[in-house]
Regions:
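Short, surface-exposed loop/helix-turn segments at secondary-structure junctions
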Residues: 25, 108-133
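Structural helix-boundary/capping segments
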Residues: 1-10, 64, 75-79, 86-89, ...
Length: 174
């Protein structure tokens, strides 16, 4: 933020109009339905079902908890995300860009975020990854233009980035 301000941009702290757990519940309803569809489609394409042993634990957890949602649940989740997009479009009328960190800390070590088995609940698995990277999911869901830019290096020599999200249809601003 200080770098942007030093380049002549006006910086203003804001709170985005979204509750992350509610967003992620709807996002994972959509992800679960799509994952089920893709796994089933792969089975049909190759002529035999995909076995659990062929899937990572993370995928099996998503399928276990969200892979059998109803069409009504899926549609409600999609409608909620569309409404969120409209809400964010209204919010963004007052701002050119929303700036946040890419991550809440240094990049994870290789394997640090691996889900080794089925013992985690979906909520715990989501919390674990989104505690580390909570900002991009909102703009991935809304479909707004956004970019992650490595702007500096940590003391350990790892890239640290800033996440810029813009208004719908204004990719050129980014």
């Amino acid at each position: 933020a200080q770098l942007c301000e030093s380049l002549g941009h006006r910086i203003e702290p804001v709170s985005l109009p979204v509750v992350l757990p509610e967003l992620l519940d709807h996002v994972f309803t959509i992800i679960g339905a799509n994952t089920r569809n893709h796994v089933d489609m792969l089975g049909r394409m190759r002529g035999f079902d995909v076995q659990d042993a062929e899937l990572e634990a993370r995928t099996r957890i998503i399928l276990r908890d969200k892979g059998n949602v109803s069409g009504a649940q899926y549609t409600a989740a999609v409608e909620w995300i569309h409404a969120l997009g409209r809400q964010l479009a209204t919010f963004m009328q007052d701002y050119d860009v929303v700036l946040s960190p890419v991550l809440t800390r240094e990049p994870a070590r290789i394997g640090e975020l691996v889900v080794p088995d089925m013992s985690l609940s979906l909520e715990d698995m989501i919390e674990r990854s989104h505690r580390y990277s909570p900002f991009a999911a909102l703009f991935n869901a809304s479909g707004q233009p956004a970019m992650s830019v490595p702007l500096y290096w940590s003391a350990a020599g790892l890239p640290m980035g800033a996440h810029f999200a813009g208004r719908f249809g204004e990719e050129g601003v980014l």
